[in-house]
Amino acid sequence: MAEVEAVQLKEEGNRHFQLQDYKAATNSYSQALKLTKDKALLATLYRNRAACGLKTESYVQAASDASRAIDINSSDIKALYRRCQALEHLGKLDQAFKDVQRCATLEPRNQNFQEMLRRLNTSIQEKLRVQFSTDSRVQKMFEILLDENSEADKREKAANNLIVLGREEAGAEKIFQNNGVALLLQLLDTKKPELVLAAVRTLSGMCSGHQARATVILHAVRIDRICSLMAVENEEMSLAVCNLLQAIIDSLSGEDKREHRGKEEALVLDTKKDLKQITSHLLDMLVSKKVSGQGRDQALNLLNKNVPRKDLAIHDNSRTIYVVDNGLRKILKVVGQVPDLPSCLPLTDNTRMLASILINKLYDDLRCDPERDHFRKICEEYITGKFDPQDMDKNLNAIQTVSGILQGPFDLGNQLLGLKGVMEMMVALCGSERETDQLVAVEALIHASTKLSRATFIITNGVSLLKQIYKTTKNEKIKIRTLVGLCKLGSAGGTDYGLRQFAEGSTEKLAKQCRKWLCNMSIDTRTRRWAVEGLAYLTLDADVKDDFVQDVPALQAMFELAKAGTSDKTILYSVATTLVNCTNSYDVKEVIPELVQLAKFSKQHVPEEHPKDKKDFIDMRVKRLLKAGVISALACMVKADSAILTDQTKELLARVFLALCDNPKDRGTIVAQGGGKALIPLALEGTDVGKVKAAHALAKIAAVSNPDIAFPGERVYEVVRPLVRLLDTQRDGLQNYEALLGLTNLSGRSDKLRQKIFKERALPDIENYMFENHDQLRQAATECMCNMVLHKEVQERFLADGNDRLKLVVLLCGEDDDKVQNAAAGALAMLTAAHKKLCLKMTQVTTQWLEILQRLCLHDQLSVQHRGLVIAYNLLAADAELAKKLVESELLEILTVVGKQEPDEKKAEVVQTARECLIKCMDYGFIKPVS
């Protein structure tokens, strides 16, 4: 009984394999293997499962299954060949060569085996040549580096060549085995920057993807020495050592699983102790006065990247708990540094922001309330421990720490603002005579006033002080920060017209001053950055954004600042935020009228929309931004380095692009200025929301533009994946619809694009929307399928048995919607022209096929009628029996009536096709001419 079931499962697996469902086929073969002990059947099942492994690129599994089949029958030629293919992909060329040699012995005339032999022979020779040349290159470089008398430039060149070798598997292994680590340590001892740098980069290459080597190198060089090298002032050196540490961490934690690097031959013990030691040393670096600002930044970067979980589905957050317990106070110390104080640690412009990001990531990585409470208590103890009426510097550090936390986990920062004396201390410091105190206090107030309740406290207790500082201070740094503080307080009500914080016209005055500073080219970039930040807050007010987009010099000054500021993340974020506000592309909660009435009845505040936030005003602002050259600025911003262009900024840029693309008439301008190309990276990387918004903007452009112009060259293939992702049923209907329009346009360009769409597995989604009740979605999906059926692999899906694809297309030809009919008839015409089998299949899928065909051939719309007549011709040409059936029906009468019409310019194609159908009937002898 079990044997019979095993045979049935084998047959089922074969059917799945023919339908290219390799996963299901593998499952069927695996189940059959458990049920049988028949050696011949076992060999066949293993051999077939190996074929599935090759198709799914599971080469290790494929080689294993083929080996089991060969164990049963050593002359199983198919199993030998499949194992050979798998071994070739795994890089085991010598073993693959032996298998194909055996195949060629068993079947000497098989050309495939002979070709494989030749190819493998060439590959093996090439591999040997590289191997021997690598050996000699390593040896030569060692000789130059060891020779004290060799010229300096030769030694430097040899060291640089070592870097290249260290990145290759063969070279790295050769260096390692030729006592290379000891030699590289000698290079580190030379204290010559260029040689030390080369040694660090070589070690970095050797550690990548190889756990055993990474462990040996970590213990040989020692973590304290690596950290001391990273602590130097030289930015290039610090970055190189950071990369070395990252390579070691990746290898020890198993993050770096690159197949070609992972051929390890040593047993490695548990790496947790080493990883913990690295983390501990990085935390110590944060508070050491010996560490440069660059070194501190790199330590923070490493902690940011490696401590918090990358996937929150993983439950183990022990690394974060360890850092919170052993290093949170050290991170808080960095956040609380005040650059103007003599006790300040060496910092760069980014150090405090990186520390804030780390605090934010650690806080987000906590799993439960007790962990968050513990985190909060450490922060509270640290801040309250700093308050000292006798020591103003310590108070400054405390307020600066709160300011830094507010830039990280805002909820936590807001709780800390509630601590006794914190807000009062901020306001008190504003009144200090010392400029440093004012600077720290004003910045802290800026960050504190994000929440409306805090902003109200500051408006009540601190606005007069801020205005006083603004009027009296001579220090530009303080003046502009005070202005931003006032801007932020003025925008605390957000877009709610009913919650304006200042008197009518006050925010416009603040904005005018910001625009004035922005246009003043004599002011340094850093100060003008604060002007943009002020506008980022104030443009929540519709009066301000309307004035701003009319001020073309200010707009262009901001765009130039954005183009020049691609190395400053704050500028990019502020510009992006300002543009989001101007285009109203932020999320707006849907207002439910019943809830509004309820809120009014219960005397709750109801948000009011500003009159200038209506659609007409937004459209006018978009037109002005496009005219001022916003697209070229956005295109420059997108090119910024990934460390500067954060995922949040990318999301903001994607929102702006989507708002700009809303009107189809503007899309040509956007494409002409490079908007299409700029959108692609935004759709591929960033937050989920950002990627969806960018993909939607891409879909809008792809739907109406010539893809060759919008996405020139190979870029067009990168557009496909974001559009396919938009077909997800979780996305809203408009996104689905415009993605289908974009894919329709792309699939009409070339077969290579159709193949790309097919490979991205868009077909099931397109078919799904062809079933949709929504008329426009169904029409768009059918039009897309009409283009896709030109691709050979799509046609094969229609040819396969056991599905209703063809039936659906035939039934859609009978729909009342002319556009759906037109698209479905086009698809059916191309399918029946491509395969005679589909002509016969069409008559079997539904009993209504003839009635539907007759309706198409009599359709009022000439394009639909023409497609119907082409289908009729394809059926007549496919098979004599089928042609006879058609002639015996009313279709002959329809063809005769259409064929007898006088062909004018519009009807020429229709009449000509009908006449070709009649000629085909005459060729069969079914009808004869009248005379």
UniProtKB/Swiss-Prot annotation:
<dbReference type="InterPro" id="IPR000225">
    <property type="entry name" value="Armadillo"/>
</dbReference>
<keyword id="KW-0802">TPR repeat</keyword>
<dbReference type="GO" id="GO:0002088">
    <property type="term" value="P:lens development in camera-type eye"/>
</dbReference>
<dbReference type="GO" id="GO:0030154">
    <property type="term" value="P:cell differentiation"/>
</dbReference>
<dbReference type="InterPro" id="IPR016024">
    <property type="entry name" value="ARM-type_fold"/>
</dbReference>
<keyword id="KW-0143">Chaperone</keyword>
<dbReference type="GO" id="GO:0005737">
    <property type="term" value="C:cytoplasm"/>
</dbReference>
<dbReference type="Pfam" id="PF11701">
    <property type="entry name" value="UNC45-central"/>
</dbReference>
<dbReference type="GO" id="GO:0007517">
    <property type="term" value="P:muscle organ development"/>
</dbReference>
<dbReference type="InterPro" id="IPR011989">
    <property type="entry name" value="ARM-like"/>
</dbReference>
<comment type="subunit">
    <text>Interacts with HSP90 in an ATP-independent manner. Interacts with UBE4B; the interaction may target UNC45B for proteasomal degradation.</text>
</comment>
<dbReference type="GO" id="GO:0005829">
    <property type="term" value="C:cytosol"/>
</dbReference>
<dbReference type="GO" id="GO:0061077">
    <property type="term" value="P:chaperone-mediated protein folding"/>
</dbReference>
<feature type="repeat" description="TPR 1">
    <location>
        <begin position="6"/>
        <end position="39"/>
    </location>
</feature>
<keyword id="KW-0517">Myogenesis</keyword>
<keyword id="KW-0217">Developmental protein</keyword>
<feature type="repeat" description="ARM 1">
    <location>
        <begin position="169"/>
        <end position="208"/>
    </location>
</feature>
<keyword id="KW-0677">Repeat</keyword>
<feature type="repeat" description="ARM 2">
    <location>
        <begin position="211"/>
        <end position="250"/>
    </location>
</feature>
<dbReference type="GO" id="GO:0031672">
    <property type="term" value="C:A band"/>
</dbReference>
<keyword id="KW-0221">Differentiation</keyword>
<feature type="repeat" description="TPR 2">
    <location>
        <begin position="43"/>
        <end position="76"/>
    </location>
</feature>
<dbReference type="InterPro" id="IPR024660">
    <property type="entry name" value="UCS_central_dom"/>
</dbReference>
<dbReference type="GO" id="GO:0051879">
    <property type="term" value="F:Hsp90 protein binding"/>
</dbReference>
<keyword id="KW-0963">Cytoplasm</keyword>
<feature type="repeat" description="TPR 3">
    <location>
        <begin position="77"/>
        <end position="110"/>
    </location>
</feature>
<keyword id="KW-1060">Myofibrillar myopathy</keyword>
<feature type="repeat" description="ARM 3">
    <location>
        <begin position="751"/>
        <end position="790"/>
    </location>
</feature>
<protein>
    <recommendedName>
        <fullName>Protein unc-45 homolog B</fullName>
    </recommendedName>
</protein>
<comment type="function">
    <text>Acts as a co-chaperone for HSP90 and is required for proper folding of the myosin motor domain. Plays a role in sarcomere formation during muscle cell development. Is necessary for normal early lens development.</text>
</comment>
<dbReference type="GO" id="GO:0048471">
    <property type="term" value="C:perinuclear region of cytoplasm"/>
</dbReference>
<dbReference type="InterPro" id="IPR011990">
    <property type="entry name" value="TPR-like_helical_dom_sf"/>
</dbReference>
<keyword id="KW-0898">Cataract</keyword>
<dbReference type="GO" id="GO:0030018">
    <property type="term" value="C:Z disc"/>
</dbReference>
<dbReference type="InterPro" id="IPR019734">
    <property type="entry name" value="TPR_rpt"/>
</dbReference>
<keyword id="KW-0225">Disease variant</keyword>
